[in-house]
Amino acid sequence: MKTPKFITYVTRGFKGLESKSVENNKDHIVENSSPIASKFHEFDEQKKSFEIINYAGHEKFVDDITERESSVPGNAVYDITVRDIDAIVPVTDDVDIPASTFRMWILAFGLATVIAGVDAFFLMRYPSVSIAAIVALLVAYPLGQLWYYIIPQWEIKLPRGIRVSLNPGRFNRKEHACLYIFVNICVSAKLVNTLIIEQIKFFGVNIGIGRAILFNLCSYLSSFGWSGLALPILVYPPTLIWPSVLSSCALFKIFHDNDNTKACNWTISRLRYFFIVFVASFIWYWFPDLIFPALSSLGAWISWCKPSSAVLSQIFGVKTGLGLFPLTLDWAQISSLSNPLITPWWATCCIFTSFVFWIWIVLPGLYYQNYWQVAHFPIMTNSIYTVSGKSYDAQKVVDSKWELVTQKYQEYSPVMLPIAFIINIALSLGAFSSMMISFFLRFPTDVIQPICHVFKYSDIHTKLLKKYKRVHWGFYLASIIVSLGLGFAFTEGWHDIQIRSYGFVVSMVIGAALYIPLSLIESRSSFTISMQAFFEIVAAFWFNGQPMALLYFYSFGFGTLQHAMHMTQSAKIGHYMKVPPRLVAALLFTSGIWSSLVNSAVTGWIMYHVRDVCTSNAENNMTCRSPKTQFNSHLIWGLVGNHIFSSDGRYSFVMWFFLVGAVVSVVVYLLQISFPKSSWKHVNPALLLGGAAQIPSVTGINYSTWAAVAFCFNYLIRRGYYSWWKKYNLITAAAMDCGVAIAGLFIYFCVVYTGGSSNFSWWGTTVSSAGCDKKGCAHLSVSDISKPSGW
């Protein structure tokens, strides 16, 4: 039965009005409020104006979109639709709700400074810790409410009649969203922080804090410009849901709305449900992370029965094995790919199919047949080896200028790659070509059509935002031009970093070209395909034997790409939460500049003022293990990457995956247009290749348990108990992530950092580290390796 059209009258004097209708569907019964959410209006108690909102057009739009995007054979539910997000995203707006307040800006700058500074500091420490942006979202709410209760309602008079209120009232949803947007940008600077550390401590180039800020500003301003120009393509289209931002939007709803509709006989409110799950997640995470770490690796129990067995550890191990037994009680392990509760079921199917085929079928076949002598090394590792089975020390084959010395290379050892590393590179290249071919095949519908229809969207979110002025596209273009100027100054002003302006320009062009295709995939699947290997391959062939040039080529392009995608995510949050577009632009612009200053200043200060930092003699374990790993990787790629992957190189076959990706993309496209109503329309060819490219950082236990949880929630529960899923699924996702994030901080700062866990040991803490799974036992002995000729 079609939901009736009606007009909802909203009076600001009445809070929490609800309108309920029940829609009977042949698949399930949905309790909804004419898909316009439960609480209609946030209001200002000081004003009593009257507003009429007609949602009939939105209802028809939602029905059309839902039918077009989610009707699949067998009534299976594959996707997250526009109708689903109406349960947690407000479909009303009050222009009188203050967003750009003094309180918001102070809290945003304060939280961003603390979190970004802590992240930059602890990046150099082992073990490291990072604070997720969702922690700021949680902390901001009590801080905002505390501000409301203790700060007097004074006004500051500024020139030209401007008045700034110190306390504009209760901490509201828009302020909360703005604060989160600001912090989310500031905490995404790990890549550029790593570059500063590599340059100063490992390459020995004294770039100084000023040049570090210049590099950061160049990256952020370019990202801001591209993300702004792409708003009509990536943010405004209502079919681009961006599932990765929905859990944050769900938290905004439960903190600022009080509605409580019944779902499958569950009457518990979203807020109460969130705190129950949050507390349970917080308490439980202490067990797999500290008290009983074996719970995190339960899938490896078969290898524990015989720890010395290399074969058992290779098949069932979860650290250096395939992880064939899907069992873990650690949410951090389950959600290491992405949060499975917010990943659409079609994307889960594509990604897990990719993993099963490439990692559980192809990879073992190549490994046990000993192609390229990979059976002499661990089956699942990202290390690079010598012919003697030791970790490769690239500093033994370079001169004082960090350039390759061929004679030293021949005397030392050729580079030997493990099978997981090889497959990772091959799949990354295949994902690139598949993604780009699909992008060009769908260019009219994915790019041209959104641009042409930017003023014609009939969804309620776009309609409500039409009352606000948008930023002129010229401002974004100017930002890109300024970033290019800063990049030219950085590359041509000094001559100690091996890269010139032409390399910088090409890197930025590649990053910009990849930005929209990658964002389109993430906006639909919540999964990010890594292009790191592609950037490194291009740089390795272009800057032959110049690892420092590779580092900057990779950092300029990949850094711009990452920041632009973060900014687009944040812009979508602003779109959902009805934050004025000009304010969103101001937040993104300001946060990028502030992040450049804070991260560069903290990292640079530590580099120049902390004694022995990034050495084995460093105090407080400030050994920079993660940046050192990245340094070794960039060094090897820059020195020999072009040789080992060229036509006469030992691993040249990976280049064929450019063709493999293109063929897969064309075949899938032909099947989709030939059978438009079949399940092929949900298949993404880039995910069929890039879905498994996260290995060896994550293994089988991560993929299999992630897919199992996604199947349980996003297929079984959604299909059988849709009203429960619609009300509680995203709340569950947010609560689990928040519980783990907060518990991780408590464990680190209260126990690990203070040394409290150093003497805590029993079977549950040692069993997973006692055998071949931890050591990475190889199938064949390293003594039997025959040194390959050439590169």
UniProtKB/Swiss-Prot annotation:
What transmembrane ranges does the database entry give? 104-124, 131-151, 177-197, 226-246, 274-294, 309-329, 346-366, 421-441, 471-491, 501-521, 533-553, 583-603, 653-673, 697-717, 733-753
Q: Zinc among the record's keywords?
A: no
A Gene Ontology molecular function term of the record: oligopeptide transmembrane transporter activity
Per the record, membrane topology reads: Multi-pass membrane protein
**One GO CC annotation:** plasma membrane
One of the protein's GO biological processes: protein transport
- Localization, UniProt: Membrane
Sorted keywords for this record are: Glycoprotein, Membrane, Peptide transport, Protein transport, Transmembrane, Transmembrane helix, Transport
**One Pfam family from the record:** OPT
**Which NCBIfam families does the annotation name?**
ISP4_OPT (TIGR00727), OPT_sfam (TIGR00728)
Which protein, by its recorded name, is this?
Uncharacterized oligopeptide transporter C1840.12
Species of origin: Schizosaccharomyces pombe (strain 972 / ATCC 24843)
